[in-house]
From Swiss-Prot:
Main location: mitochondrion
Subcellular locations according to the entry: Mitochondrion membrane
Name this protein carries in UniProt: NADH-ubiquinone oxidoreductase chain 4
The reaction(s) this protein catalyses: a ubiquinone + NADH + 5 H(+)(in) = a ubiquinol + NAD(+) + 4 H(+)(out)
């Protein structure tokens, strides 16, 4: 683990040399390929120092972080072109990536908490510094307060655990079982807001709409996964409480997923639609995770990875048309089949991935999750069928309204994409569809 972290630390001086933008990006791809070679399918924590280690769960998420951060630089070419504080932008992304890797490879619960909360700060800087509208101040405030309000109880819960056990190590804490309601709520609420669960999801659409494309990618790709990862880690010593209370979260998530899907069908803003669809997807991830079945845990992990790639790619596509047309509105982004014919293919591929068509990872994850939730309670079939149906409905709405129809009268030409954009789409889509061939690493990590 340490070699990856030092590699990133030594990339920081490169940010301040002129014309080094693409060099940094190539180096980040290089790091992700090195990390790919480090994979030895350990079922237990491997490469343990005192506080850094890696098992299959954190391995996949670290790889996703490296990949998405490399693609963020590929997507944010406008910052490089207009020289919009690009040195600080690179620095921000590298620090964010460093914090994310440390979060996912932390062995100690307290270290995890520390990095989990500090990864919020670079994200906030991304939204406030490179966002598009003045409302980004409000979005940043929402993001900050929703997340920080619930993280204090979590800290108190961690201190209580330290007092009782005398160790913060995840590996040792699995031997304990706590039958304490308040501790359960303290530890879980922080992750529920980060997921986000329906009812505490209001910060997400705001943050997504105001963020630049890189901010949206990192939010959709990794920030939403932090909650799921933390929950997978702490659920093992909160099993008794979870059996007692899980029905609350599962029902809120499933009903909320259906409601959010209905909200999606009324959106006019491309980015807001994709953001709300993320809430619906994370709702089903949360429900599957809290059933605490083998299928549920593996499926939530699979869908987290798949959703990270898929919705990140959709945000990139929305940004491509935003750069050309200067608007995110569905009233202006219509008839794009005439405007950018070759981008329509990517719109189609990523939209179909979003509604879990084969052979994407989304399909695999959703099959696992549907199985686990139905095995938990067969009544949830009703909500799940609605969820699946509306998921396809709003994805088709997004695709058909943006690609078909009459071209907006203010647009007088057509535009072809750049090779950079096609590469960006390919690098989102290829892992998403090829990883299904390696699905044992999504099932056998537990």
């Amino acid at each position: 683990m340490l070699k990856i972290i030092f590699f990133l630390l030594f990339l920081i001086p490169f940010c301040f040399i002129n014309n080094m933008y693409w060099m940094v990006q190539i180096m980040m791809f290089f790091i992700s390929f090195i990390f790919l070679l480090m994979n030895n399918f350990m079922n237990y924590w491997s490469e343990i120092s005192y506080f850094l280690g890696c098992d299959m769960l954190s391995y996949g998420l670290i790889l996703l972080s490296l990949w998405i951060c490399s693609l963020m630089l590929l997507a944010s070419e406008m910052i490089n072109k207009h020289n919009n504080y690009k040195n600080l932008f690179l620095l921000n992304i590298i620090i964010l990536l460093l914090l994310l890797i440390l979060t996912f490879s932390s062995m100690s619960l307290f270290m995890f908490y520390l990095f989990f909360e500090s990864s919020l700060i670079p994200t906030l800087f991304l939204i406030l510094g490179w966002g598009y509208q003045p409302e980004r101040l409000q979005a940043g405030l929402y993001l900050l307060f929703y997340t920080l309000l619930v993280s204090l109880p979590m800290l108190i819960g961690i201190f209580y655990l330290m007092n009782k056990i005398g160790s913060m190590n995840f590996y040792l804490m699995n031997n304990f079982m706590f039958n304490y309601d308040l501790l359960y709520f303290c530890l879980l609420c922080a992750f529920l807001v980060k997921m986000p669960m329906f009812l505490v999801h209001l910060w997400l659409p705001k943050a997504h709409v105001e963020a630049p494309v890189s901010g949206s990618m990192i939010l959709a790709g990794i920030m939403l996964k932090l909650g799921g990862y933390g929950m997978l880690r702490v659920i093992s010593f909160l099993q008794l409480m979870n059996l007692k209370y899980s029905f609350v979260w599962i029902s809120i998530s499933l009903v909320g997923g259906v409601l959010v899907s209905l909200v999606c069908l009324r959106q006019t803003d491309l980015k807001a639609l994709i953001a709300y669809s993320s809430v619906a997807h994370m709702g089903i991830v949360l429900s599957g995770l809290l059933t605490m079945t083998y299928w549920g845990l593996c499926g939530s992990y699979t869908l987290m990875i798949a959703h990270g790639l898929c919705s990140s790619g959709l945000f990139c596509l929305a940004n491509v048309s935003y750069e050309r047309l200067g608007s995110r509105s569905m009233l202006i982004n219509k008839g794009l089949l005439n405007f950018m014919p070759s981008m329509t293919l990517w719109w189609f591929l990523l939209s179909s991935a979003n509604m879990a068509a084969p052979p994407t990872l989304n399909l695999l994850g959703e099959i696992y999750l549907l199985n686990s939730i139905v095995s938990w309670s067969w009544i949830s079939m009703i909500l799940l069928s609605f969820l699946s149906f509306f998921s396809a409905a709003y994805t088709l709405y997004l695709y058909s309204f943006s690609q078909h129809g009459k071209l907006f009268s203010g647009v007088y030409s057509f535009s072809s994409g750049k090779i950079r954009e096609y590469l960006l789409m390919l690098l989102h889509w290829l892992p998403l569809n090829l990883l299904i061939l390696k699905s044992e690493s999504f099932m056998l990590w537990l």
